[in-house]
Regions:
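Contiguous, glycine/small-aliphatic-enriched amphipathic segments in soluble metabolic enzymes
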Residues: 1-123, 172-194
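Short, charged/polar low-complexity linear motifs in solvent-exposed/disordered segments
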Residues: 33-35, 136, 166-167
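Short, acidic/small-residue loops that bind anionic groups at enzyme active sites
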Residues: 107, 118-153
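Amphipathic, alpha-helical segments enriched in basic
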Residues: 1, 19, 71, 75, ...
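Ligand-binding beta-strand-loop-alpha-helix segment within the catalytic cores
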Residues: 95, 142-189
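Short, well-structured alpha-helical patches and their helix-loop capping segments
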Residues: 88, 100-101, 128-131, 155-166, ...
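Unusually extended, aromatic-enriched hydrophobic runs near protein termini
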Residues: 3, 8, 36, 42-43, ...
């Protein structure tokens, strides 16, 4: 069973987009999977009820696999990460990440403020032993199998050691989640301009 916490308040099109996307994912997943929407309960309930009544009525069967975790604060896309972490400790993003740290959820998804999510993850989830910096992973679709790109522009000043760490992270991901026995590793650099 997988329990995924979803930041229902994060992103430009929240709460509708994260709730609609999670409903579609839950409808396609086996019945042992569960979604926790994290955010303002009354807003989530209203949006969830509207979607299940109209556009996603065919997914009403998944309602019993959904729970809501109250989080009264929202980290805006314009908030500075450090200010958001200190001033919005009851935000949907921070509470969702803490759900993973405390073992209540297996994963966390947010379309919200990327810098705040990285900072909150560093504070509450920590780094795996041997890593000095996290990397954002993005799956790029291709005509064949998707390509995993790590550190999708998040860090402009990576050391050679950090690039090796990213390659190791990507290799583990490609083996474990993409089923690749011998994943290839490449380097794409933006370089530095004068």
């Amino acid at each position: 069973m997988a329990r995924i916490a979803v930041d229902a308040m994060g992103g430009d099109l929240a709460p509708r987009a994260p709730i609609a996307g999670a409903l579609q994912a839950l409808g396609a997943l086996p019945p042992q999977h569960h979604i926790e929407f994290v955010g303002q309960t009354s807003v989530i309930e209203a949006e969830l009820d509207a979607l299940l009544r109209d556009e996603f009525a065919s997914l009403a069967r998944v309602r019993d696999r959904i729970s809501i975790v109250e989080a009264p604060e929202i980290i805006a896309m314009t908030d500075k990460p450090s200010v958001a972490l200190r001033g919005k400790t009851n935000s949907s993003m921070v509470i969702g990440i803490k759900r993973v740290a405390d073992g209540h959820a297996h994963g966390f998804v947010s379309a919200g403020n990327t810098g705040a999510q990285m900072a909150a993850s560093l504070v509450h989830l920590k780094l795996h032993a041997g890593l000095t910096r996290p990397a954002i992973g993005t799956l790029f679709p291709t005509a064949g199998d998707p390509i995993l790109v790590l550190d999708s522009g998040a860090n402009m000043d990576c050391s050679p050691e950090e690039l090796v760490q990213f390659a190791r992270i990507g290799t583990v991901y490609a083996r474990a989640l993409l089923g690749r026995d011998n994943p290839a590793v490449g380097l794409l650099s933006v370089g530095e301009e004068a």
